[in-house]
């Protein structure tokens, strides 16, 4: 008898659907997750405007939109990525958010105190307390949406595919690009980049989004709703009637305190310390890690 070559068994059919194979690409996953959030956001605003009377539209649409963004993100991660959404886990969420908010307030005060001492920032009077409540829903939406998008979608997916360092570069570039419209200076670009690195490092440390959400919310709320200091070029009318004057490198000019030298020093130090802590904890990913 002549020897014969064993015939290999037939290959198992690829049961993975084509759309799921496409969604495995990092950029496609980022796009799909972003669309899930944007659609939820748009739908929530449309429903609120059609269902609620105009006098309630100040707060409720932003609060509902924040929840809708989180739901859109959760739905994508749970149904498409088919995993437990641990970064939005409820256990300990309030405590983590509060720690982040405390850190955001600390960074804000460290930024503003030297400006107040130098006479760059001045308190000219006391207004009514309505901005403290009116601006809270808007700042909550901003912090939730941006952290879900930049840290939860872009950084997380890029990190899984290309490692932490490349993901840091990509997510920071997107965060800075989103804040470019307006009268932003080079210092403002650097402050925005440093803040993005700090927010991302906070996510890396905990692998949850509550800490950076708290930091982001507190920073924006403190300056806009309390001290009446422009945030990212947006005019602010807060509880305290404050004003900024002096050289632009200190006051930040029209862009606000986020383009000042003190903010750059504070955020650069915060980013360095948080990134070092994340690295020391072994939370830098060097290579591809598949999602569950």
What are these regions (language model features)?
Residues 2-19, 29-30, 34, 38-41, ...:
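Transmembrane helix-loop-helix hairpins at the membrane interface
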Residues 103, 107-143:
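Long, hydrophobic/aromatic N-terminal blocks
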Residues 2-22, 44-101, 116-127, 278-285:
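Membrane-helix interface linkers and caps
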Residues 32-33, 61-66, 102-106, 260-267:
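Hydrophobic H-region at the start of alpha-helical membrane spans
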